[in-house]
């Protein structure tokens, strides 16, 4: 996904614009959205509605975490949202160990959630 596509999606989902983010936050959100979209593609063909339903939770968490609006531990009861927030954390420069500690989950769980992004 490119930045313009992500800005439109974030605008449609959350009524936010590019001006609501710093350049760093926007870069993290764009990278996270691209990764989340790739992961959803592995579920096979789906309608736009189905895709939007599956994107909403992880994207909300990625935006909230990237902007510092919510701590990672807030998402531990919802694996999809935790995954979105942790993906944003990786693109913000944090390690898997840092994210696991922040979320209060085991390193093994954080590694499983992050998959190929694990480091």
Where are these regions (language model features)?
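Short, solvent-exposed alpha-helical "recognition" segments
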Residues: 77-80, 111-119
